């Protein structure tokens, strides 16, 4: 308990405190398995796309490599702490650690939302304007787009961090979640949280809603182009790919919108937890499966990398 007037120096995450020992053990095993699988898949994509393979020397694979890097950063920001709190009895996190975690969630989350929009635009140009693809999406443009996503993530993280911690914290320090989530933390501050929540809402329109509109618009144009030109078999394959991409993207955008585009805080923590789990765990795990492992060139690059590894083993003995 905090004494009246005392300044908060630490927070208590109570997301799993009410869970039984058996439930925490089950959640620990589940989250550890999902985290390990996600790290392995995204790590493999980073290795494959950064590996000097001429067939993967295109903007799309450059985007995929950075998407996997963002997913690794994003899931590492939250899951390791969750695993620790499922084992230990004290769920205390320092004020500085909470600020740091929130910054990286903001930074990486915003960068990924923007990058996914750029990736959708890349596919739009490649399919709808194939003859102009190289001039429009050159290597220089590709690097600038990725740099823009990272830059806006870094800058936006600073802005949202200031908005979240502009008021002092002298009240309750119990966070009803399994990590430091901005809307809940803001509700613990001394001042009126509505200004900060509205600022986050306005910011989310720019960094979440706008990329989502660009992404959906790009895929709608892709589908329209394919339906007018491709054969029936080509239509089915492209429709399946676009549908799977849109599904993952909508999961990310809608779950983030539900958590951050809610200035009146009408949703309780228990209702928000599934959405938080969706964009912190499920999306980073699904991205490599949907975007990379279904790609023929990625599969062939994995086979070539495995073949080179096997050939190198006898020489090292």
UniProtKB/Swiss-Prot annotation:
GO CC annotations, alphabetized: plasma membrane
Stretches in topological domain Extracellular: 1-25, 77-100, 162-198, 260-272
Locations listed in the record: Cell membrane
Membrane topology field: Multi-pass membrane protein
Disulphide connectivity of cysteines: 98-190
Keyword Membrane: yes
Entry annotated with the keyword Transmembrane: yes
GO biological process, one term: detection of chemical stimulus involved in sensory perception of smell
Domain of life per record: Eukaryota
Family: Belongs to the G-protein coupled receptor 1 family.
Free-text function comment from the UniProt entry: Odorant receptor.
PANTHER family for the chain: OLFACTORY RECEPTOR
Name used for this protein in its record: Olfactory receptor 10AD1
């Amino acid at each position: 308990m905090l004494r009246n007037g005392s300044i908060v120096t630490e927070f208590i995450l109570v997301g799993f405190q009410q869970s039984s020992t058996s439930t925490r053990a089950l959640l620990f095993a589940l989250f550890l398995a999902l985290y390990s699988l996600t790290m392995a898949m995204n790590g493999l994509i980073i290795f494959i796309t950064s590996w000097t393979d001429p067939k993967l020397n295109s903007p799309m694979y450059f985007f995929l490599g950075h998407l996997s890097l963002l997913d690794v950063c994003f899931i590492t920001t939250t899951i390791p702490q969750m695993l620790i709190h499922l084992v230990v009895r004290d769920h205390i996190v320092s004020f500085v650690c909470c600020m740091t975690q929130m910054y990286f969630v903001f930074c990486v989350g915003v960068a990924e939302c923007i990058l996914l929009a750029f990736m959708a635009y890349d596919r739009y140009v490649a399919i709808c304007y194939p003859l102009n693809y190289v001039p429009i999406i050159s290597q220089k443009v590709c690097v600038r787009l990725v740099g823009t996503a990272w830059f806006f993530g870094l800058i936006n993280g600073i802005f949202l961090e200031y908005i979240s911690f502009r008021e002092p914290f002298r009240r309750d320090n119990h966070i009803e979640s399994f990590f430091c989530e901005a809307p809940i933390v803001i509700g613990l501050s001394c001042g009126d949280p509505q200004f900060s929540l509205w600022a986050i809402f306005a910011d989310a329109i720019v960094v979440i809603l706008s990329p989502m509109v660009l992404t959906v618009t790009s895929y709608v144009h892709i589908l329209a182009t394919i339906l007018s030109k491709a054969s029936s078999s080509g239509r089915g394959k492209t429709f399946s790919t676009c549908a799977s991409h849109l599904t993952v993207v909508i999961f990310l955008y809608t779950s983030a919108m539900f958590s951050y585009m809610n200035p009146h805080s009408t949703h309780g923590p228990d209702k928000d937890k599934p959405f938080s789990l969706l964009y912190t765990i499920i999306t980073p795990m699904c991205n490599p499966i949907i975007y990379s492992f279904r790609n023929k060139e990625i599969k062939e690059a994995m086979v070539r990398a495995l073949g080179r590894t096997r050939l190198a083993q006898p020489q090292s003995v």
